[in-house]
Amino acid sequence: FDNYTVGTLQGQYVVDSLDLDNAGDKTYNIEFTAGDPADNNAGYFFNGAFDVLKPYIDAGTLNVVSGQTDFDSVATPAWDTQTALERMQNILASYYADGTQLDVALCSNDSTALGVTQAIESDYAGDNTVLITGQDGDEANLANIVDGKQSMTVYKAVANEAVVTLDLAKAMLAGDTIDESLIEKSGWDFECAYDTESYETSDGNKCPSFLLVPTVVTKDNLQEALVDPGYYTMDDDGYLHPAN
């Protein structure tokens, strides 16, 4: 999957939800929670979101009250929920205890979003609904989306990833040229792009990649995005569970 795009989808969701392009003199407060610094994917997620939001930060439309905007400051070792919870509790106590309004908690994934949500529920002095992003479509987070506690998650259909991997392996065994032509030959019914620039090996060599496009999931499209394709089932009460 295109992990940079995961971040841009999160960032663009914030832009669209707050209508930042038409904010005028209105300003919003945002805090970032990124992933494990030992996981190279975490940097792609964070950079994708930050690149979208940086123009609004530079313009003063978005304010990072804590001042924590670099990856190392906002990273969460092991993507740990408790670590994310405690860090957000510290931020809330240090910068928002006086009633300053927090509008957005940009979380790179669902495990960190879960901790951030818990911290906001227990320690946030404001009474507004905080926009919270995530990624993965974890069951607990989907329940929070149903309950209005989390705004969105970015879902990556691993079944589609498996299809691409299988077709790629077949093409390699057949001695076919591996390039963008594989996409047309395979006739996949999902969006995929061939990329030769974005990703590198550990020694700095470019790594050609087939990048699938993830899906933004909100309360409004849970059925269409997750249930109808068979990834999840939905109970009568609206809560989702992974399909067997």
Residue ranges and their predicted role:
Residues 1-244:
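A residue-level marker of the well-folded mature domains of exported/periplasmic proteins
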